[in-house]
């Protein structure tokens, strides 16, 4: 565990590779200045990665280093191999062996995904000294909890919106496949609307209920007086917009956290 690292002004390429989509962002300091989003399935080989990334890197020729936060091993390896060949600097992969800004307790530590490590690192950048509940609302929905003194206290994993909707279609005889979007009304007037409303509102209320439950657990079990909630992920804007008490929404939270981990580990990767 280490104190806040001062961000470098040198452009850094951050690869955030999720189960469905991948984001490649060029950071200057703590903020992205350019980005490219692609389907993770498109990262099938180093050559495929190169075809996608060359235009982005051509616009930012000063970017010499990269950090990769990937939950899809094959795609992460393809990106890493191409970046190692093309960049003159360092390529760091996020994992639990890095110098982290929080104390980790997970069995085994290597099973805590790069996305969750990066998101927790982002939460350690918050100035206020309070516990944090970190939400990543994507293909899966993860909750990770940090104490005010930045100890990892545990997490939860549940299916995301598309997984819920696809399970209804795939595991029943007649329910249709439905595109998940914000429902027009609470009570559906067609089968598709009923599924859409049930999945989306069910997810909103699950998230709100679990946040309340975790806050109570933090008070009773760990003596934490307040917990900040941070949300990210492809489906976070939809769910957060429907919550009664919306959390801090940071679409770039995982990338910001990965960038922070690169700064904390500059010496060890040089």
Swiss-Prot record:
EC numbers for this chain: 2.7.1.33
Cellular component aspect of the GO annotation: cytoplasm
Catalytic activity: (R)-pantothenate + ATP = (R)-4'-phosphopantothenate + ADP + H(+)
Binding site for substrate: 106, 113-116, 191
Gene Ontology process terms (BP): coenzyme A biosynthetic process
InterPro entries with a match to the protein in the record: ATPase_NBD (IPR043129), Type_III_PanK (IPR004619)
KW Transcription (keyword) present: no
KW Metal-binding (keyword) present: yes
Annotated keywords: ATP-binding, Coenzyme A biosynthesis, Cytoplasm, Kinase, Metal-binding, Nucleotide-binding, Potassium, Transferase
Annotated compartments: Cytoplasm
Reported function: Catalyzes the phosphorylation of pantothenate (Pan), the first step in CoA biosynthesis.
Entry protein name: Type III pantothenate kinase
Source organism phylogeny: Bacteria, Pseudomonadati, Chlorobiota, Chlorobiia, Chlorobiales
Recorded name of the encoding gene: coaX
């Amino acid at each position: 565990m280490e104190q806040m690292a001062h961000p470098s002004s040198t452009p850094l390429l951050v690869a955030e590779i999720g189960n469905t989509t991948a984001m490649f962002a060029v950071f200057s300091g703590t903020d992205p200045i350019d980005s490219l989003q692609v389907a993770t399935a498109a990262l099938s080989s180093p050559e495929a990665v190169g075809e996608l990334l060359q235009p982005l890197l051509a616009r930012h020729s000063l970017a010499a280093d990269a950090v990769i936060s990937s939950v899809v091993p094959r795609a992460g390896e393809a990106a890493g191999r191409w970046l190692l060949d093309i960049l003159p600097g360092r390529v760091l992969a996020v994992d639990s062996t890095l110098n982290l800004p929080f104390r980790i307790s997970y069995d085994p530590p290597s099973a805590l995904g790069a996305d969750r490590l990066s998101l927790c690192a982002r939460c350690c950048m918050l100035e206020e000294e309070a516990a944090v509940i970190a939400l990543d609302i994507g293909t899966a929905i993860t909750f990770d909890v940090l104490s005010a003194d930045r100890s990892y206290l545990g997490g939860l994993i549940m299916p995301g919106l598309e997984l819920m909707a696809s399970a209804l279609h795939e595991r029943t005889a007649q329910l249709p496949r439905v595109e998940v979007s914000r429902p027009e009304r609470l009570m559906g007037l067609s089968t598709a609307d009923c599924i859409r409303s049930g999945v989306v509102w069910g997810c909103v209320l699950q998230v709100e209920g679990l946040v309340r439950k975790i806050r109570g657990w933090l008070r009773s079990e760990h003596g934490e007086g307040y917990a900040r909630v941070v949300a990210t992920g492809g489906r976070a804007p939809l769910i957060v917009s429907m919550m009664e008490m919306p959390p801090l929404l940071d679409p770039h939270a995982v990338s910001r956290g990965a960038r922070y981990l690169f700064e904390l580990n500059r010496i060890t990767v040089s």
